[in-house]
């Protein structure tokens, strides 16, 4: 995480804690000529527009005070959505039994992408059951080899 994102997280985390919300992720991204500071929040049952607005107002006020980002940017606060990223240990633990999409830095048993049910997670290894054509396969993926992981929608 960059120094700017660490400073932003130090501002945002107390606000989400105060509002009893989970800070899922923070991204600072350039799209075309514009910069966007995106803050993703959640709670059991999901967040509503009023909670996003409350976080946005409080974060905007605190960011103006400490000003960790010098250039102009747009602030966006939203839910992570149905395909929520899995980043923290708790995210992986909560995803056990759910359908996930995982990519790795390098091939493992000839694959770099898996989409299936996360059967277990022990802190070091993800065990995923995938369907390959008509058969079920159980795959073990070391956590340190995971490039990205997120919840997925099963069709």
UniProtKB/Swiss-Prot annotation:
**InterPro entries hit by this protein:** Ribosome_maturation_RimP, RimP_C, RimP_C_sf, RimP_N, RimP_N_sf
Keywords carried by this UniProt record: Cytoplasm, Ribosome biogenesis
Q: Which GO terms describe its biological process?
A: ribosomal small subunit assembly; translation
Q: Name one GO cellular component term.
A: cytosol
- What is one Pfam family matched by this protein? RimP_N
What is the annotated localization of this protein? Cytoplasm
Instruction: Note the HAMAP family from the entry.
Output: RimP
Biological role: Required for maturation of 30S ribosomal subunits.
The entry assigns this protein to a family as follows:
Belongs to the RimP family.
What name goes with this protein?
A: Ribosome maturation factor RimP
Source organism per entry reads Listeria innocua serovar 6a (strain ATCC BAA-680 / CLIP 11262)
The beginning of the lineage is: Bacteria, Bacillati, Bacillota, Bacilli, Bacillales
